[in-house]
Amino acid sequence: PEECLLREVWEETGYTLTSYRYRGLVTFVSGNGVTEYMSLFTADGFVGEPIPCDEGELEWVDIEDVWNLNIWEGDKIFFRLMDEEEEFFSLKLVYDGHDKLVSAALNGKPMELFDILNPDGSKTGIVRERGVAHREGSLHATAHIWVVRKNHKSGYDVLLQKRSACKDSNPGCYDISSAGHV
């Protein structure tokens, strides 16, 4: 894949890569009978001058702005993994044949997917991976259970959990003891 990387970058941009890193292998299952395998690289060193590209217009985009572009939901997963400096990974993305993500697996283990909701609670039709949904602040269904017990002082104690430092949202804050995604 390295020869392809160097050739395609030069042909489509005019740049010769001087520093790159093999990040992962992505398997795309379209749902239309087509499966593609993509070797995923990042590059942070290059020389040369940009050239016009007949396959589309090249444009430098701030990494934070990528999340606001019209990209596939699965692409957001590997952008997140690269942003989090995930070691070399294998990511399998399965679509329903109509561009809707129906399953994702990281290194052979299923990833949690959510139906994204409108403010009224109805489904948008978008399915998003847990880490991406939390990063983007996407509305999704959860169930929260308050566990209580009677006491003699105020009537009730509530069981709380101090969220660990590794939680992806509100680390160190107190929360209910039992909650989960629907």
PLM ranges: what are they?
Residues 23-30, 130-134:
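Short, solvent-exposed loop/turn elements at beta->coil junctions and helix N-caps
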